[in-house]
Swiss-Prot record:
Protein name per its UniProtKB record: rRNA-processing protein efg1
Upper lineage: Eukaryota, Fungi, Dikarya, Ascomycota, Pezizomycotina
Family: Belongs to the EFG1 family.
Underlying gene: efg1
Any GO CC annotation of this UniProt entry: nucleolus
Residue span of region Disordered: 1-44, 168-187, 227-300
Subcellular location: Nucleus, Nucleolus
GO biological process terms held by the UniProt record: maturation of SSU-rRNA from tricistronic rRNA transcript (SSU-rRNA, 5.8S rRNA, LSU-rRNA)
Function: Involved in rRNA processing.
Composition bias, Basic and acidic residues: 27-36, 262-275
InterPro entries, A to Z: Efg1, EFG1_rRNA-proc
Pfam family, one: Efg1
Coiled coil: 61-148
Lineage top rank: taxon: Eukaryota
C-alpha cells in the first residue's frame, strides 16, 4: 500500500442530523448601549473654542459659528454632569428606598385586607362599621402616600427615610438608660433631626398634592419646581447682598475732621524719631484712636 494513500473518512453520525450547526465564529449581538460623551473631552473642546474666540483677528462668520458650538458644548457638559449626579444619587440611596418601599407595600396590603374583611363582616352594627371603615380609609390613604413617597421621591435629591424614626425608636428602647447616663443627645443632633423631620413632612405634603394633580412622574424626575413656595431663603439672601454698605462716619472710625476733610494719617515712631521727637509723645496717639473706634462700634 503506498504511503500517500488515505482512506476516505466517513461522516460522524449525530442523533440530530437536521439541527443547524452553530458556528463559533459568529459573535453574539452586542447590547445597544448609549454612548455618553466624555466630560474631559467636552471640557477640552470648550477650552479650545474659548481660545479661538479670544483671537482678535477672527472673522465674524467664524466667530458666530464658534459661539454656537461653545453654547452646544456647554449644554452637553451640563447635561452629562447632571446625568452622572443623578446616577450617583440613585446608586447611593437604592437600598434604603427598597427597604422603605417594601415596608410601605406591606402596610398597604395589610390595611386593604383588613378593610375588606371589615366590609364583609355582618356581625357589627352598621354605625360602628362605617366609623371603623372611615378610620381605615384614612390610614390607608396615609399608607398610599407613604408608598408613593418611597417610589416617586426625586431621584436627584438626598433621600430621607420615612421609617427611620420608627427603627430608631425600636432600637433605642434598650439603650435609654445608657443615653440618660451620657446626658442625652446634643443640641446639634436635635437641630438636625428637627430639620430632617420638617423636610420629610414637606415632601409628604408635596407627594399628596402630586397624587391629586397626577404629576408624580414629574416629581420623580425632578422636573417640578419644588422651591416655588420656599423662595424666602433666596429672597433674603439677595436682599442682604443687595443692601449697600453704609460708609463709616467720622464718629465710628474715630478720625477727627477739620472742615469736612479727614486729617492725615498718624505719624509713625520712625518719622518722629527722625525729627528728634521721643517715642513718649507718639504713644498716646494710637491709644486715642483705638478707644474712640471701639466706642463707636460697640456703642449701644
Amino acid at each position: 500500500m503506498p504511503k500517500d494513500f488515505k482512506p476516505p473518512r466517513t461522516p460522524r453520525k449525530t442523533p440530530y442530523p437536521d439541527r443547524p450547526h452553530k458556528s463559533k465564529s459568529k459573535s453574539q449581538p452586542d447590547r445597544e448601549e448609549k454612548q455618553h460623551p466624555s466630560v474631559n473631552e467636552l471640557k477640552r473642546r470648550i477650552r479650545d473654542v474659548k481660545r479661538l474666540l479670544a483671537k482678535p483677528d477672527l472673522s465674524a462668520d467664524k466667530r458666530v459659528i464658534q459661539e454656537r458650538a461653545l453654547a452646544g458644548y456647554e449644554k452637553e457638559l451640563a447635561d452629562e454632569e447632571r446625568r452622572r449626579e443623578r446616577s450617583r444619587m440613585i446608586k447611593k440611596y437604592h437600598f434604603v428606598r427598597f427597604l422603605d418601599r417594601k415596608t410601605a407595600t406591606k402596610e398597604v396590603k395589610r390595611l386593604t385586607r383588613k378593610r375588606d374583611e371589615l366590609a364583609k363582616n355582618s356581625d357589627i352594627d352598621e354605625a360602628t362599621k362605617q366609623k371603623k371603615l372611615e378610620q381605615l380609609n384614612v390610614r390607608l390613604h396615609t399608607a398610599n402616600v407613604n408608598l408613593n413617597y418611597t417610589i416617586y421621591y426625586p431621584l436627584t435629591e438626598k433621600y430621607i427615610s420615612i421609617y427611620a424614626e420608627k427603627k430608631k425608636k425600636n432600637e433605642g428602647q434598650n439603650e435609654d438608660e445608657d443615653v440618660q447616663m451620657e446626658g442625652g443627645p446634643t443640641q446639634e443632633e436635635e437641630i438636625v433631626t428637627a430639620a430632617t423631620t420638617a423636610q420629610k413632612k414637606a415632601m409628604l405634603q408635596t407627594v399628596e398634592k402630586c397624587m391629586q394633580d397626577g404629576t408624580l412622574d414629574l416629581l420623580r424626575e425632578g422636573k417640578l419646581n419644588l422651591n416655588a413656595d420656599s423662595v424666602t431663603e433666596g429672597g433674603t439672601k439677595t436682599e442682604t447682598k443687595s443692601k449697600p454698605k453704609s460708609k463709616p462716619s467720622s464718629k465710628d472710625t474715630g478720625v477727627k475732621t477739620v472742615g469736612g476733610k479727614e486729617n492725615a494719617k498718624p505719624r509713625t515712631k520712625t518719622s518722629d524719631s527722625k525729627r528728634g521727637k521721643s517715642a513718649k509723645h507718639t504713644a498716646p496717639a494710637p491709644a486715642e484712636s483705638d478707644s474712640e473706634s471701639d466706642g463707636g462700634f460697640f456703642e449701644i
